[in-house]
């Protein structure tokens, strides 16, 4: 399967400017979004994508706070893409957040931030309630993204990164994951966002660009509903992977 994957063509990047269209859509849909189920201070940590920082997720964070969640950015500056350096730092941040909140943390990760969120859940499933990823490549790392060419020019071995990720993916984890992806994504190959092995992953397709994930009203509504399901399960004392919780989760959308 991996052999047939390719990064999106550079010519498609012009489509990413359409993410500006998400702002008027967000305003038009805001009355409906504001009526989504409310949280009760449940902790949410939002991880930005490669090259981005907390400023890129400020709109999403503000929306989740409006709904009553304790949402915060990761506080680690710009995402350098150095997973080996970032993962222990994110783990420390998340563990501290969970300890102060005295409950499991919901993780939302955009692109590479989603990969980090999955790895945090793999390392500390006891502290993570759920993971929501936005346009996150789960196979190949940067290999099936438009930044692959830049990595090649820098002498970075993307094949070695892919092999390392394959090994990591063999370590199973049971934290529920909602993987939101788009065939209109011109940065990450949408096929690379599909986890074909893990039973704990639900894939949901949306119509937005890669840059639009953080501002799409469709994405916001999905996130709000997923948070509500897990928050309600927690209030009723259900484990995140319990049969009752799975029954309450909306049917997965086929890809």
Please give the residue ranges for each predicted region.
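Flexible, membrane-associating and regulatory peripheral segments of lipid-active enzymes
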Residues: 1-44, 57, 62, 67, ...
């Amino acid at each position: 399967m991996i052999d047939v994957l390719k990064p999106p063509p550079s010519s498609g990047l012009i489509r990413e400017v359409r993410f500006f269209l998400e702002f008027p859509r967000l305003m038009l849909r805001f009355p409906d979004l504001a009526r989504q189920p409310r949280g009760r201070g449940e902790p949410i940590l939002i991880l930005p994508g490669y090259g981005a920082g907390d400023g890129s997720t400020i709109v999403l964070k503000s929306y989740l706070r409006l709904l009553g969640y304790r949402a915060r950015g990761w506080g680690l500056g710009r995402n350098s893409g150095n997973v080996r350096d970032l993962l222990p730092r994110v783990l420390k941040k998340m563990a501290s957040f969970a300890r102060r909140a005295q409950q499991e943390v919901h993780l939302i990760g955009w692109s590479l931030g989603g990969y980090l969120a999955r790895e945090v859940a793999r390392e500390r499933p006891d502290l993570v309630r759920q993971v929501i990823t936005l346009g996150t490549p789960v196979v190949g790392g940067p290999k099936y993204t438009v930044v692959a060419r830049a990595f090649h020019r820098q002498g970075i071995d993307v094949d070695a990164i892919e092999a390392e990720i394959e090994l990591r993916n063999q370590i199973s984890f049971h934290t529920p994951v909602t993987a939101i992806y788009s065939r209109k994504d011109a940065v990450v190959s949408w096929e690379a966002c599909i986890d074909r092995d893990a039973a704990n992953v639900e894939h949901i397709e949306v119509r937005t660009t890669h840059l639009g994930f953080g501002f799409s009203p469709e994405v916001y509504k999905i996130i709000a509903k997923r948070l509500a399901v897990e928050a309600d399960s927690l209030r009723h004392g259900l484990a995140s992977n319990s049969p009752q919780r799975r029954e309450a989760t909306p049917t997965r959308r086929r890809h």
